[in-house]
Amino acid sequence: MCLAIPVRIEELLDEQSAVACIGGLRKTINVALLDDLKVGDYVILHVGFALQKLDEAEARRTLALLAELGQLAEAEQAAQGDAS
């Protein structure tokens, strides 16, 4: 399964690449598909490519939901470990 996630642009390197913050990590991504990007913009990232700009509020909501899902998965794994 592939997942596209919101990321924040931290630095523009050139017309085709930028540095994005992904879960606290900085990674170079391809931004060739988008115009008029600025530092601080949020984009949807899929397999290393920024696909579209995203409103900051929507990006934050999505990131919060993903964090919640991660916590749920951790709790389920812990519960399965306790059942053994």
Swiss-Prot record:
SUPFAM superfamilies: HupF/HypC-like. Disulfide bonds: none annotated. GO terms for molecular function: carbon dioxide binding; iron ion binding. It comes from the Bacteria. GO terms for biological process: protein maturation. It holds the Pfam family HupF_HypC. Involved in the maturation of [NiFe] hydrogenases. Involved in the biosynthesis of the Fe(CN)(2)CO cofactor. PANTHER family: HYDROGENASE MATURATION FACTOR HYBG. Belongs to the HupF/HypC family. This is Hydrogenase maturation factor HypC. It comes from Azotobacter chroococcum mcd 1. The gene is hypC.
